[in-house]
Swiss-Prot record:
Alphabetical UniProt keywords: Cell inner membrane, Cell membrane, Magnesium, Membrane, Transferase, Transmembrane, Transmembrane helix, Ubiquinone biosynthesis
Name this protein carries in UniProt: 4-hydroxybenzoate octaprenyltransferase
Topology in the lipid bilayer: Multi-pass membrane protein
Reaction(s) catalysed (UniProt annotation): all-trans-octaprenyl diphosphate + 4-hydroxybenzoate = 4-hydroxy-3-(all-trans-octaprenyl)benzoate + diphosphate
Gene name of the encoded protein: ubiA
MF (Gene Ontology): 4-hydroxybenzoate polyprenyltransferase activity
Statement: the UniProt record of this protein carries the keyword rRNA processing: no
PANTHER family per the UniProt record, alphabetical: 4-HYDROXYBENZOATE POLYPRENYLTRANSFERASE, MITOCHONDRIAL, PRENYLTRANSFERASES
Any one GO biological process: ubiquinone biosynthetic process
Any Pfam family matching the protein: UbiA
Top-level taxon in the UniProt lineage: Bacteria
Cofactor(s) this protein cannot do without: Mg(2+)
Function: Catalyzes the prenylation of para-hydroxybenzoate (PHB) with an all-trans polyprenyl group. Mediates the second step in the final reaction sequence of ubiquinone-8 (UQ-8) biosynthesis, which is the condensation of the polyisoprenoid side chain with PHB, generating the first membrane-bound Q intermediate 3-octaprenyl-4-hydroxybenzoate.
Pathway(s) the chain acts in: Cofactor biosynthesis; ubiquinone biosynthesis
Length: 294
């Protein structure tokens, strides 16, 4: 069998690119994927077209990677002061700034071409908003304590795009899902920001974790409650059944677990709570898919 052995420096460079794009850390991709699938399945009232499933699965992967590249570009001068990020390839000098920008542009271009070639005009128009949100979010932490709100919009923009691709229109359900996901993103990314709060305070990075202060867990709980309420509204308006509501109950139960994990506000507990949100999103998707299938 033919084997190709890459030179050591090439292998090291590819590994740095993979770390820059978070190929080794799929949690962000999964958190973006589940709400996209919610929209695809609900807009199709069952299984979406195979083409849209492939396009949006790949699009989620590419745009999340693009977002990581531009985020590290924006934060390159701050990341060296934060324990969790000081060894990132761009901060450590193993990847240059222009390379991160080029990767962002290239991945956005590939995603845009998929939309142009395989979806409809409405989805194409919406894609410009998605690209803009992906670009501006990383810079918001310089100017506002609500960068998580911009991240929520960026992470939720695939919902109207997926809906438009499948149904060629948008509905009230689209925006209910969008709102639920924005609130959910703010909740789980606040948990993530609590991991870095002490370092962020030192270097002047703004976040909801800093804004909320000692009320952080209470506000996260409020956001989580609002997510569950809105998803119940989605179920009622879409006339969904027991499987869907079981998925929402599972999400609510996991939200309680997240509060337990973050009870002492330490790095490990908050990070575990953040990671566990993957299962909350999956639970809703599984319930929705089963409900529409049966």
């Amino acid at each position: 069998m033919l084997q190709i052995t890459l030179p050591t420096h090439v292998h090291a460079r590819l590994a740095d690119y993979a770390r820059l794009l978070r190929i080794d850390r799929p949690i962000g991709t999964l958190l973006l994927l589940w709400p996209t699938y919610w929209a695809l399945w609900l807009a199709a009232e069952g299984g979406p077209s195979f083409a849209n499933l492939v396009i949006f699965t790949l699009g989620v992967f590419f745009m999340r990677a693009a977002g990581c590249a531009i985020n590290d570009f924006a934060d390159r001068d701050w990341d060296r002061h934060v324990k969790r990020t000081k060894d990132r390839p761009l901060t450590a000098g193993r990847v240059r700034a222009w390379e991160a920008v080029a990767l962002f542009a290239g991945l956005c271009l590939v995603s845009f071409l998929m939309v142009v070639l395989f979806t409809n005009t409405l989805t194409l128009y919406l894609s410009f908003g998605g690209a803009l949100l992906a670009f501006i979010y990383p810079f918001m932490k310089r100017y506002t304590h609500l960068p998580q709100l911009f991240l929520g919009a960026a992470f939720s923009w695939a919902i109207p795009m997926a809906w438009a691709a499948e149904a060629n229109q948008l509905s009230q359900l689209t925006w209910l899902l969008f709102t639920a996901n924005v609130l959910w993103t703010v909740a789980y990314d606040t948990l993530y920001a609590m991991v870095d709060r002490d370092d962020d305070l030192k270097v002047g990075i703004k976040s909801t974790a800093i804004l909320f202060g000692d009320a952080d867990r209470a506000i996260i709980a409020l956001l989580q409650t609002m997510v569950v309420v809105i998803l119940v509204m989605v179920g009622q308006r879409a006339e969904l059944g027991s499987f869907y509501y079981l998925g929402v109950v599972a999400m609510a139960t996991l939200f309680v677990y997240h509060q337990y994990l973050a009870r002492e506000r330490n790095r490990e507990g908050c990070f575990k709570a953040f990671l566990n949100n993957n299962w909350a999103g999956f639970a809703v998707f599984l319930g929705l898919a089963l409900d529409l299938a049966f």
